[in-house]
Amino acid sequence: MRKFYLFYLMTHLSAQGSVMLVGGNAESYGGWSDDPYGWFVQQADSGKIVNIDVSEASAWYPAYFINLGADSSSHELQIPNIFSANSQNIYHDLVTANGIFIEGGDQWDYVQTWKGTLVDSAIHVVFNNGGVIGGTSAGLAILGEIVFDAENGSLTSDQAIANPYHPRISFTDDFLDILSGVLTDSHFNDRGRLGRLVTMVARRAQDHGEDILGLGMGIKTAFCIDQDKIGTVYGKMITVIHQTDDTELYCVPAEPLRFTHLKFHQLLHGAVYDIDNRVLVDPGENMSYYEMPYEYLNNYSDLTINGSNQSSENYGEIIVTGITGDSDNWWYGGLGTTVGDTSVPDAVIIPKMWTDYYYFPNRIISGLYGIVSDPPKFVFYLDDNCSVSINENGLMTVSNYAHILDAFPDGYAGYLNGVLPGISDATLHYFTESDTFDLSTYYIVESIDDELINSNYFAIQSLYPNPFNPQTTLHFSLMKQGIVKVNVFNIRGESIDEVVNEFHRPGEYSITWSGENVSTGIYYFKMKFENEMKVVKGVLIK
């Protein structure tokens, strides 16, 4: 049975409009883009839509919008310089539109030509009056509160990770700000940009104390965000990252980035995400819920895994094949899996992570591909001259740097058309020299106790009565808002009931469970909140 997150919508008092973010690559009549661009037309009330560019604006877009139901007055508009950007005629043309769409190109051209002009003002007027604003590629890049402006040119993930203060990392903070608290990146998967987005989010945290939401938009993908800031994925996939309460940051010039405990989602077509509350509303039809048993024990032996050796992938439980074949295997279905020697249980190991730019997409996606083949899993992304050592207790120690994607203990996972992997609620760590990570964290029940159980985010006061027949009540309190999950397991570790899987606000709660349909015995109540999990033992006596 599919599970859905319940959520609370906050009423927005402003008349702000809606937004369409497009990751790049070609739209087409009758293709993937019809649904999101049709949504754009609907948000514009089938009125006038103007597509704009600094360079020559495309006549294809208005024809496409009109074909999807927009008013026949829709048209393209080139705004090539500051003089034109301050034209009253252009301003009037734009403010009388129901939607404005910004084409791809170079975001620095847009920043230096339109920032602070009447074009800037007109876009805000349309949006604040309930209109729809959209952009693709560079047009997408300028819609967040924080803009990676590419003033000094672009950069790759390996450059960003090695030096978070690389001169090509530059921002504009006071341009359109259509999506507050958001930084976007386009062509995300096909250019392997995970490392640079993580680095840019880190820079904003380090330099300005900001907790921003990073949105990585894949090609042939649109993210359509309504007036309540609820976005739906169309096409392929988007990546969402943000800090958590446990995030640790070390970000200095000319040293590898350390940035831990980042929430990570890669969401597929049909997924729905609340960007204000940072909650997955609906995983969509392409991802299914997975969960590990409440108690699960693995054995480890002393081992060093070297990121310079491709053969290191054999130490994992799953090996992803096709990584070093065609550089587009991730996109066209050329990845596969085989079995490793399981020296590191539940692991997918990706060596030589940033060795060759053309294989960045294959290597990043292959880790997710391995997780989805049999979740939950850990992914070790290791570069040349990097390694990790694991002792017999499962404690991992990093040499130089390593990236770990932790998909435990549960979440949603699946493939789009059997090819592109999606996952929710994973945790991403960018570790550096001497950092440690306990691979056995999820394998031992953290506590089975009838007394008060505390964590950073919640407290279980009691399970009462206990023993019980047939009902008992779990009393708990929350220190922050989020999704609460409570499952009941029998003594064999089999999940027999999901008691709750809902959004809760901070406060005191009680939930009652009935053992009317099960036999006398010991039952375990597992409560999960954020990345913490606690278990309470109950005894049913009939």
Positions of predicted regions on the chain:
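C-terminal and late-domain segments of enzyme folds
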Residues: 16-45, 56-61, 149, 155-309, ...
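Catalytic nucleophile loop
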Residues: 102-104, 126-147, 304-317, 321-324
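C-terminal outer-membrane/trafficking sorting elements
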Residues: 452-542
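ATP/NTP phosphate-donor binding region
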Residues: 31-32, 36, 40-92
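Positively charged n-region of N-terminal signal peptides that target proteins for export
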Residues: 1-4, 541-542
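Sec-dependent N-terminal signal peptides
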Residues: 3-13
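Flexible gly/pro-rich beta->alpha loop and the following alpha-helix that scaffold active-site loops
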Residues: 85-132, 304
